[in-house]
Amino acid sequence: AWSMCVWAASVLLSRWNIPVSCRVAINGTERPVDEHYGIHPKIYLLTERGMTEQGRDKFFARMLSGKEEMERFEENRPCRAIDEQRDELRLIREQSAREMPEMHWDRVYVSEEDVIFPVENQRNWWGNRVEIITLPGGHYPFYVLDNWEKIWK
């Protein structure tokens, strides 16, 4: 699970009792909107309220590491409506304040230059629960973890 989906996976897997052989968290925690363990609530709210075309472009630029990644990302840029993304951010904020699951994770990746989900907060959350594997780059790690074999090993 990546980013906010670490929290979402924790909610859904515990609710549906789905058997999973390996749980991998990438650049996220089970407390997505949290001053100490996730994205600071004030920053999150600014991101949510600033989700316009220009705001989304700024977010994507912060999510990626450098010009080369930005050029690659532009080739497969998500085509989602701004209102839909803003609603998703609002719902995650509201629901994550009510649903705070915790489950065992087998592997955790944290990108050393993640400015979306603060590295220190991710490390605070995971602590000694599981080994943290450090990746180069920013929040979007899929130019480093570019196939399933790299994620699982």
Protein language model regions, located:
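Catalytic histidine-centered segment of alpha/beta-hydrolase-like enzymes
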Residues: 116, 132-152
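Conserved alpha/beta-hydrolase catalytic His-Asp/Glu region
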Residues: 52-93
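Gly/Ala-rich beta-loop-alpha elbow adjacent to hydrolase catalytic centers
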Residues: 1-9
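Short beta-strand/loop motif that positions the catalytic acidic residue
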Residues: 102, 107-110, 114
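Short, hydrophobic alpha-helix immediately C-terminal to the catalytic nucleophile
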Residues: 9-14, 119
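Short alpha-helix in the alpha/beta-hydrolase fold that links the catalytic acid
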Residues: 104, 117-128, 146-147
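Hydrophobic/aromatic beta-strand patches that form the interior of the parallel beta-sheet core
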Residues: 22-26, 107-109, 133
